[in-house]
């Protein structure tokens, strides 16, 4: 494969041995002499297509400008004369996440205008968001356990990638290439079972009357690296027990009230009967033999 002919600065890049110790020494010397410090350790940080370029060192007497390009485009400046050591390049990649990008960090003196001969810069590694962005932690949107069927729905994660002004979800971008793995087990055991789907929904057979725990993981099998996401939060079914507990909070007090009412009613009736018998005895004539 032919290496893309990336746009270049009109002056040669100064070679620096990429070691942390030498980099620190050069930073101190450059800072003392008022020379722009050459950036190093350029690293891409990307999750669900939110992409940030990071580098070192923190500036002393210099500022940074970040540029980005593709093999077929000129360099475009994004972050101008900043003192931070990171630049968010998401918006530049969002319209075409399958393109391969190259960035460079240019170090300048604070009062420099334009790209002068004393500016120094470093190129980033090439980066293709579609292949290299990390998959974020998925979220279980809903679940339902009915009889012997467990239905689990995974939330369709939205990203900052877009097409025709519309933001895309992971499913929009990867289609059937995005799969989810469900790990599930009876809450009373530890042995896990798995199920795979290329949609966002699972419907699996389970044992009736048992509670289950489960989590999901996003997977892109076609990738060489970064195939799997972190595991989602583990959740467990408690639907039937939950309903029983909710009903008990209502039914038990009602039953107690009914029992009290019945007891009071019986007590009142008993008192009335006793009073009636007492009145009858007092009104009867004496019987003298």
From Swiss-Prot:
Disulfide bonds join 79-87, 213-236. A lipid is attached at residue 271 (S-palmitoyl cysteine). The keyword tRNA-binding does not apply. One of its GO terms (cellular component) is plasma membrane. Residues 1-32 form the signal peptide. A motif (WKS motif) lies at residues 44-46, 75-77. It is found in: Membrane. It holds the Pfam family Tissue_fac. GO terms for biological process: blood coagulation. SUPFAM superfamilies: Fibronectin type III. Keywords: Blood coagulation, Disulfide bond, Glycoprotein, Hemostasis, Lipoprotein, Membrane, Palmitate, Signal, Transmembrane, Transmembrane helix. One of its GO terms (molecular function) is cytokine receptor activity. It is a single-pass type I membrane protein. Interacts with HSPE; the interaction, inhibited by heparin, promotes the generation of activated factor X and activates coagulation in the presence of activated factor VII. Belongs to the tissue factor family. Initiates blood coagulation by forming a complex with circulating factor VII or VIIa. The [TF:VIIa] complex activates factors IX or X by specific limited proteolysis. TF plays a role in normal hemostasis by initiating the cell-surface assembly and propagation of the coagulation protease cascade. This is Tissue factor. It comes from Cavia porcellus (Guinea pig). The lineage of its organism: Eukaryota, Metazoa, Chordata, Craniata, Vertebrata.
